[in-house]
Every structure is written in structure tokens, then in C-alpha cells.
């Protein structure tokens, strides 16, 4: 052939066929893509043994024997009848339905397992006092698993009722007493009620500033910070956010300072400055008596 001649370059197209001059079945890799785009002929010629190419995938005999038989049966049925029979449709749709069913079963099993593990943890932690209303995603079967949210809601309701009951005896104390500067320590007993109650009420504003005229406004203002609920557990511990010791209000601090000034004005006065008298006494300080021979001690050694 012409490609064996040494003077002709190996990649140059020779003969009338051009790119097809290579042996059939051999793919030539180095050719101009522009010519190939313009040329309607295929870029690589089809192989010579077109009929012997195995178009069906090779399925090993050990595995998938059942699948191979079903495929062969479906092929024979489709070759006999032009319209595919409903048996083949059902055989095609069966694995899809099975997979979907297994997915649903697995998801329900997983949710049930997680719910049971949460339930077990709540039993150990002692948080199993009330139920839980499920969100829209949960099924009705899962509503029987109990939660803490409803317990907190019930505790808030109970604490609100106890706070209402404790407001009535406190209103009797809110009338200004004969001694307006009485210390609030006598009335702080109402802050910690005896017995086991579900909530510690907040410090009552009526007991904090009894002398002020706007008791009603301050009560409305402080009612926003309601009583904090206590979560009671089976272990006997009461869980509550620690807010520190009850701080006195600024009005209370100012009133306490005013009582101190009224009781003993001498103690509240600032101390007198006795600095000028002291300076007058210590005026005759000794002046430095430096003689020329003492300067040798004060000068650095390098001079």
C-alpha cells in the first residue's frame, strides 16, 4: 500500500478514499477534526465483524439466573404478540412497588425505634409527667408517645393560678404602714412560701416599695415578669434557672439612703479635709545640706 512507501508521510491521506485508506477496523487517531466535521462520512469506519458483536450484556450463570429467565420469557412473549401482555407489565412493576413498600416499612420502623428510645430516655430522666401533641408530620400511631412540652404548659398554668392566689394576701400588705421606712426583710417571708409549690413567685412589687403612691402602675409593670415555673422530676430535684439573689430596686436603694440621712445626718456627711493644718505643722522640713564633697557620691562613675 501507499502508506508503506518511505517518501510519503504516514499521516498524509493517500488514495481517492482519503481517511478510509487505512485498514478496515483500525481507528486512525491523528486526523484534522475540521475535515471530519465537513465530511459526511463517519469519523471512524465501522468494524468488519459487525454481526459478531455481542449486543446483549453477558450475565454470569451463577448470579441473576431468575432475572435472566424472566427477561428471556418476556422477550419470547413480546416476539409472539405485538402488544405486551399484562403479565409482563406486572412483572416490571412488581420490584418498584416492593421497593416502595420496604421503604415505607423501614421509615416507620426507624421512627418507631427513635420514639421508643426517646421514651426510654425520658423515663430514666423523669420527664414523663404529661403528654405531647404531635406535629402534622407524625402519624396518629405516634401520638401515644409522651413529651415534655405539654408538661411545661400545665406547669405554667398552675403557676399562674398560684400567683393569682398569692396576690390577694399581698394586696393587704400593700397599704402603706405607719412606719414608711420599715425594712423589707420583715416581709420577705412571702417570697419563699412554705410547702412544695410548683412555682416560686417573683418578688412582689407591693412589698418592695410600700410608700410609693403608684403601686398599681408598678404592679402592672412588673407583672410582665411572671413567676418562673419549676420542673419537678421523680428524682426529687427542682430545676429552675438561677437568677441570683433578689436585687433591691433603685427606688428601694434611694429610700434606704434617705432613711440613713434622716436618722443620723452626722454619719452621712463627708469627712473634713484636714490637709492644710497638717501641712502647716510639717512646714519646717530639713533642707538638703549638700557640700561639694558630697557631689562625688551623686555623680556617676564614668565622669
Curated annotation (Swiss-Prot):
The molecular function terms of the Gene Ontology recorded here are: oxidoreductase activity
Q: In which tissues is it expressed?
A: Expressed in neuronal pyramidal cells of the hippocampus and in the neurons of the cortex.
Where is the sequence biased in composition, kind Polar residues?
76-89
Give the primary localization class: cytoplasm
Q: Which UniProt keywords apply?
A: Cytoplasm, NADP, Oxidoreductase, Phosphoprotein
Carrying Phosphoserine, the residues are 183
Q: Which Pfam families match?
A: P33MONOX
Residue numbers bearing the Phosphothreonine modification: 44, 175
| Function of the protein | Potential NADPH-dependent oxidoreductase. May be involved in the regulation of neuronal survival, differentiation and axonal outgrowth.
Protein name in UniProt = Putative monooxygenase p33MONOX
Annotated organism of origin: Mus musculus
